């Protein structure tokens, strides 16, 4: 699979789960404006990246793939925002999505790795539909003793989320970029140097 996600200085690839979810809801809703679309997309990216920054480094060290685990929150946030949910329903949607958070680094280098992002996108849409059907879920899926942060890393850094959502917007700082090569970012300097030598 070509890995063409946009990421720079982040701990996850937020576009991969977020954009498909926003596109699906926009196609279904049809009354959304471009401004609504961009706001939902940016909110999804913001939530995913801040959660990825807040979770303990053990999350990654223990084998979790943040694009799959944190990405469910991007797709659920973006989808529920574009669906114009009130805050209570957004929280329910996030909680339902959180119960679907998955992705293991053991599958890096296989065809299953990009599947993580696709399942994270799907999780947000499933959560949206279940919320619309009246499903209930915890209002504290992230910080509860048996919630996401404890289950997936053992702890979290509240300062990475509280009072920093949208301040600054991740889309602006550190920003997003298009990968110059369809591979992991650690290989990019060598690939760029090799391309320069060939050219």
Question: Residue ranges of each PLM-predicted region?
Answer:
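Flexible glycine-/small-residue-enriched beta->alpha junction loops
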Residues: 43, 47-70, 92, 96-100
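Active-site nucleophile and cofactor-binding loops and adjacent substrate-binding regions
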Residues: 10-16, 36-41, 59-72, 112-117, ...
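Glycine/charged-rich beta-loop-alpha catalytic/anionic-binding loops adjacent to active sites
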Residues: 1-7, 50-62, 104-110, 167-176
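Functionally critical mobile loop/hinge segments
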Residues: 66-68, 72, 77-199
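Hydrophobic alpha-helical hairpins/lids featuring a short glycine-rich hinge
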Residues: 1-53, 58
């Amino acid at each position: 699979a070509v890995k063409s996600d946009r990421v720079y200085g982040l701990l996850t690839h937020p576009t991969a789960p977020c954009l498909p979810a926003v596109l699906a809801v926009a196609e279904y809703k049809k009354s959304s404006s471009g401004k609504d679309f961009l706001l939902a997309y940016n909110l999804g990216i913001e939530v995913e990246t801040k959660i990825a920054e807040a979770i303990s480094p053990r999350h990654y060290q223990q084998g979790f793939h943040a694009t799959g685990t944190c990405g469910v929150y991007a797709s659920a946030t973006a989808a529920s925002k574009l669906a114009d949910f009130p805050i209570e329903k957004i929280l329910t949607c996030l909680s339902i999505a959180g119960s679907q958070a998955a992705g293991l680094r053991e599958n890096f280098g296989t065809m299953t790795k990009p599947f993580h992002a696709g399942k994270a996108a799907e999780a947000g849409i499933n959560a949206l539909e279940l919320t619309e059907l009246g499903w209930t879920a915890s209002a504290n899926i992230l910080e509860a003793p048996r919630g996401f942060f404890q289950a997936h890393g053992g702890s979290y850094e509240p300062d990475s989320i509280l009072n920093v959502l949208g301040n600054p917007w991740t889309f602006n700082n550190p920003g997003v970029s298009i990968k110059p090569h369809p591979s992991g970012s650690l290989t990019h300097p060598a690939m760029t140097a090799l391309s320069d030598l060939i050219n």
